[in-house]
């Protein structure tokens, strides 16, 4: 009998996300907020919503609700692009910096706890395997298109 690898990976993502959501609750943020802020922080300033959605790997409409929430919290601003009035550029606010640092601390601490007893070499090997699985899946999608 084959192992249900897809189910195992999906379950791992769910429990990891639930743990991160629980730990970010005191900051009134979620894992989705963190992923979005993390990408905005690490991408060049003034990314469009479309570019950000691509970087995260989601559809733009899925991103809009999260951006609305982050804007309500005063962590980002959105401005109409001068070259394309349909596009919006996303910028972090000054108040986002300490929040991002706090979130990064929570994420780093959580990651260290989750990886307890696992060597850096094992983590590297897992990352390579996950990347290979993703590459194989993307190739299968391309072949079906």
Curated annotation (Swiss-Prot):
**Feature: DNA-binding region:** 49-72
Has UniProt tagged this entry with the keyword Transcription?
A: yes
Gene Ontology MF annotations? DNA binding; DNA-binding transcription factor activity
Give the matching Gene3D superfamilies: Winged helix-like DNA-binding domain superfamily/Winged helix DNA-binding domain
Q: Which NCBIfam families match?
A: PRK03573.1 (NF002926)
Q: Which HAMAP family match?
A: HTH_type_SlyA
Q: What name has this protein been given in UniProt?
A: Transcriptional regulator SlyA
Task: Please give the organism.
Answer: Pectobacterium carotovorum subsp. carotovorum (strain PC1)
Show the taxonomic lineage.
Bacteria, Pseudomonadati, Pseudomonadota, Gammaproteobacteria, Enterobacterales
Please name the gene that encodes this protein.
slyA
